[in-house]
Amino acid sequence: MNDLSHKPSVLVGMSGGVDSSVTVALLREKGYQVQGAVILFSPAHEKAVEEAKTAARQLDVPLTVLDARADFEAHVAAPFCASYCAGRTPNPCLLCNPNVKFRSLLQAADRLGCEKIATGHYARVEQDEKGVWRVCRPKSDARDQTYMLYGLGQEVLSRLLLPLGEYQKPEIREMARQAQLECADSPDSMEICFIPDGDHAAYIAARGLHAPAGQFISPDGKALGPNLGIDHYTVGQRKGLGLALGRPAFVREIRPNGDVLLGWSGEEFFRKVWLDRFVTPDGQPLAAGEYLVKIRSAAKAVPSEWNGSDLLTFTPAVRAPAPGQSAVFYKGDAVVGGGVIQQTER
């Protein structure tokens, strides 16, 4: 019999939270054959595994536990620590998504016979006029997570469903309440998921690593006294420096030798950054030209000029672009590429 109503089977990445749980419910309502998968990235994720099991029982979907601890250590935890110890400010989600999370989901989908994968990210996936799949902004600007997904290529995007891209967060919570899900009012996760207390310096130290510690250097080049180690600071930081300078200052530069260079408040705006590890959704070079660019997930996208190679010039200047973070490029609503900030210039 020719079943015109057939919907593909889909493997949903679950965490036990409201977003991934409602993703399961929405896809099942649309007729998809849904399975769940929860990824064990590190010991800190054991609670999420149990919460995902609870959600899967409530939703009556089979759940597979994926052990990605070795990949997470190699592709996220170790590079994260090394980057901080080198004076950079990494974003672990941008390391994890293309290298661990979505790769694990895709491999599991193949093993389980699922044609599609899905997550609870607030974004959309659309195919452009040339047949290229792209991550696009969601309906909810306040929840936009496209920045976090810029590293995904066609292998993932062509099979990825993101149903929450069409909804606002309050709508998702209301759906969870209507379904009487235990996670309906669970708080949003804001911290680094594998460092629940947010103290990345303590996490690095617990792994037996010691970031260089040098001097605070004043804007006019004078040594002001020892710092705690460069893993305690990030570019743009103003609070927690432990200095009394008589006027507001911020971290302008972090040097691998352990020194932390300061700037006066008002001087933290930069016009140029140099990027490397540049990627695009289709693997093709991004042409020189004008784009809207974000340097942080929650930042506003600003007009920028790309030289087609490595140099990005902002108009207007942006506050405290941090080496180790990513610059993500947009044309309209679509993500068209992104790279890692290596160097900045006022």
Report the location of each language-model feature.
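AMP-forming adenylation/ATP pyrophosphatase catalytic core
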Residues: 118-346
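ATP-dependent adenylation/nucleotidyltransferase module used to activate substrates
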Residues: 1-150, 161, 170-171, 251
